Regions:
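Histidine/acidic-residue-rich catalytic or RNA/ligand-binding cores of hydrolases
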Residues: 8-10, 47-50
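Histidine-centered active-site loop/cap adjacent to the catalytic His
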Residues: 49-96
Length: 107
């Protein structure tokens, strides 16, 4: 979530969403690529305890991601990529970024 907070503070959100859409469309054209997106795992993303630094998850979260990939969870397809990107955009454009820092101060 700190990554998205940085994008928001720097005015880079829309550029990030556009880049993600372009990259997704290009990768979906590759027959030998499977693309996964876990930006909708809000309980993980929005909890700072799940990170080892500003952008990287703790090892146990990385293990969960590997389990999701093995199970096929989060697979992006031509049929679902636009709705996933729109859902992602909706959350991150409207997220209360101040709340993540307040929650950690109160603990």
């Amino acid at each position: 979530i700190c990554f998205w907070d940085f994008q928001n503070q720097e005015g880079l959100m829309m550029r990030q969403f556009e880049a993600e859409q372009i990259a997704t469309e290009m990768l979906l054209d590759c027959a030998n690529v499977k693309l996964y997106n876990f930006y909708d795992k809000y309980d993980i993303i929005c909890n700072l305890d799940n990170y080892r630094d500003r952008e990287h998850y703790a090892p146990e979260i990385n293990s969960k991601i590997l389990q999701w990939i093995q199970a096929g969870d989060g697979l992006i397809t031509r049929d679902n990529y636009m709705s996933k990107l729109e859902q992602e955009k909706e959350l991150y454009l409207n997220y209360d970024y101040d709340s993540i820092y307040q929650a950690n101060v109160e603990q």
